[in-house]
Amino acid sequence: MIFYSLVFNPYEVNTYIVAANDGQCAIIDPACCSPDEQAVLKNFIADKGLRPEWLVNTHGHFDHVIGNFFVCQTWRDIKTAAHRDDLFLMENVYRQGEIFGFSVEQPPTPAVFLKDGDTVTFGNDGFLKIYHIPGHSPGSIVLHSAEQNRVIVGDVMFRTSVGRTDLPGGDYDLLIDGIEKKLMTLPPDTAVLPGHGPETSINRERKFNPFLKNKKTT
């Protein structure tokens, strides 16, 4: 598999495209919010010769799903997926956008509701395991590739930080507990691909993230 990333919208959301060797791919958090950004995504996929099979949202906040409508209109056969616990957010995406001054097309309801332990498979070698880590939102998920030693974490964790928990459905204790039990138990050299900002690693966050309970001091 190959992991690509593009940065979209004023919130600088990382949109990830994970491609199997045969070109089938999954689009994670399409965040393109303007015609120019939509063209960037469409042209990137065309230039790489990719064929989108999945659209997966790590969570239902509008900045991460603002491109869902465009993706579903462009690739009509794409399968859409998210965690059911964020459905209430996704059903009100246009209202979320209005609060922040954005016009957001209401995306289709996810066709597949993912849960902890599920897998997303595509092409001849695309395989991502799902972990449910609520706290930033009730239905936040991360997608892990053991083979590639990478995990896409949405807004669950960032470099030396974690996702905010003051939005509807947020829960700080749940977030930290999930990070400790499901992310910090991954191999230390696992690359962490967040929803905003630069890449990090499990080892780096264990050493330097001030929000983790069992932070290493050596």
Would you name each region that the model predicts?
Residues 6, 114, 133:
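Hydrophobic residues at beta-strand termini and immediately following loops
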Residues 10-12, 114, 137-138:
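Short acidic/glycine-enriched loop/turn segments that link adjacent beta-strands
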Residues 26-29, 54-57, 130-132:
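Short catalytic-loop micro-motif centered on adjacent basic/acidic residues
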Residues 32-33, 96, 119, 125-218:
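Metallo-beta-lactamase
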